[in-house]
């Protein structure tokens, strides 16, 4: 289907299907500065992406080791039905297959957090990414998606029903994983309950869903589906199709590790605010999405974080006798720091780090308040 004339000139839209080459607007330098290795090796191999089975009685220990060493892991045995994951992927594929004119009804304008278009972080870069995205809040799912389906017909109702079912499953899973994270920090069951009673981390966590479509690319060596970045919130579940493309950055030596596409598995990424909450014991992970010549790829990011007004600082229980490494910051405040970091090349986490002397005078802030 040809692109309507009025859309071919719209800066918010690029017709990936019609592209026979990668234009300079979408060509990224430095994509091959580091080697790429396969992360599907057997457990124990240095580049094998950790796998955590939530049914394992030692799952908390496995979560802790993966969060400390990688900042990410593959999650299996999570209890989310496979048939639901299949329906979610099919619904996402159908949405991105809509005509351009329909998708553009929901385009994300500058300053908007929800809608259709490029990834939200794309505004920080001069080059465009080889992908389309759609962001919405599960709490406002039906109103957000009315922009895309204003008549609220069958497709709208079906899409909403599938995403609402997925949200219910994922929100319950997030609570279970949060508990595993806290146990991995060394908290007892009673301490986990006390932390939740006092600070209500699980109760108040907010969720955002971001859908991605990475079209096949005529020259994947020049294009990038999603720029390397860390997630800003607590942690993220990534549901990816059976086409690999997610890569994690590893040091010693520097390299990109391709996450294997495992049926039914989800990827969990630790975010920056969780690194702050755990005082650096668990660290966020740089990751990116690459494209290929043969196949489209779909993914869904389910992002968890604190409410906008909540200040996040290291948990007392995470300090283990060490000083606080970060100052208290709200999510919006941290996003402002990240914006400065993107434009200057600095590290956002280093910009909110505090010195030992500062930590000695800042103990009253060492809570999620």
Curated annotation (Swiss-Prot):
- One GO BP annotation here? response to light stimulus
Q: Which residues cross the membrane?
A: none
The record's listing under InterPro entries reads: DIOX_N (IPR026992), IPNS-like_FE2OG_OXY (IPR044861), IPNS-like_sf (IPR027443), Iron_ascorbate_oxido_reductase (IPR050231), Oxoglu/Fe-dep_dioxygenase_dom (IPR005123)
Query: Where are the active-site residues found?
Result: 297
Catalytic reactions on record: gibberellin A20 + 2-oxoglutarate + O2 = gibberellin A1 + succinate + CO2
Disulfide cross-links:
none
Give the binding site residues for Fe cation: 229, 231, 287
- The kind of enzyme this is, by top-level EC class, is oxidoreductase
Q: What is its EC number?
A: 1.14.11.15
Cofactor(s) recorded for this entry are:
L-ascorbate; Fe cation
Q: Which UniProt keywords apply?
A: Dioxygenase, Iron, Metal-binding, Oxidoreductase
Q: Which GO terms describe its molecular function?
A: gibberellin 3-beta-dioxygenase activity; metal ion binding
Q: Which residues form the Fe2OG dioxygenase domain?
A: 205-306
Domain of life per record: Eukaryota
- Keyword Metal-binding present in the record's keywords: the answer is yes
Function summary: Converts the inactive gibberellin precursors GA9 and GA20 in the bioactives gibberellins GA4 and GA1.
Q: Which protein family is it in?
A: Belongs to the iron/ascorbate-dependent oxidoreductase family. GA3OX subfamily.
In its UniProt entry, what is this protein called?
Gibberellin 3-beta-dioxygenase 2-3
Instruction: Give the gene that encodes this protein.
Output: GA3ox2-3
């Amino acid at each position: 289907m040809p692109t309507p004339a009025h859309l071919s000139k719209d800066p918010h839209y690029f017709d990936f299907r019609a592209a026979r080459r990668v234009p300079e607007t979408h060509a990224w330098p430095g994509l091959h500065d580091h080697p790429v290795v396969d992360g599907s090796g057997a457990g124990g191999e240095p580049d094998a992406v950790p796998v955590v089975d939530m049914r394992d009685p030692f799952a908390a220990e496995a979560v802790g080791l993966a969060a400390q060493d990688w900042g990410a892991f593959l999650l299996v045995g999570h209890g989310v039905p496979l048939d639901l994951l299949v329906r979610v992927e099919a619904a996402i594929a159908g949405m991105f297959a809509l005509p351009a004119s329909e998708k553009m009804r929901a385009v994300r304008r500058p300053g908007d957090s929800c809608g259709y278009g490029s990834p939200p972080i794309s505004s920080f870069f001069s080059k465009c990414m080889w992908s389309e995205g759609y962001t919405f809040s599960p709490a406002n799912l039906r109103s957000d998606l009315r922009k895309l389906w204003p008549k609220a017909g069958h497709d709208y109702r079906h899409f909403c029903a599938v995403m609402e079912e997925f949200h219910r499953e994922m929100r319950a899973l997030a609570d279970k994983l949060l508990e595993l994270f806290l146990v991995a920090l060394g908290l007892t069951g009673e301490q986990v309950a006390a932390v939740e009673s006092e600070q209500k981390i699980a109760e108040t966590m907010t969720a955002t869903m971001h859908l991605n479509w990475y079209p096949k690319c005529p020259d994947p060596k020049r294009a990038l589906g999603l720029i390397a970045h860390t997630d800003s919130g607590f942690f993220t579940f990534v549901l990816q199709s059976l086409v690999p493309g997610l890569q994690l950055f590893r040091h010693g030596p520097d390299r990109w590790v391709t996450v294997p596409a495992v049926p039914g598995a989800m990827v969990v990424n630790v975010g920056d605010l969780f690194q702050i909450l755990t005082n650096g014991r668990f660290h966020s992970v740089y990751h990116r999405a690459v494209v290929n010549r043969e196949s489209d790829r779909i993914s869904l990011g389910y992002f968890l974080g604190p409410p906008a007004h909540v200040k996040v600082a290291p948990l007392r229980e995470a300090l283990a006798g060490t000083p606080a490494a970060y100052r208290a910051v709200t999510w919006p405040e941290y996003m402002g720091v990240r914006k400065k970091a993107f434009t200057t090349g600095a590290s956002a986490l280093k910009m909110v780090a505090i010195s030992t002397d500062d930590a000695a005078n800042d103990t009253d802030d060492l809570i999620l308040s």
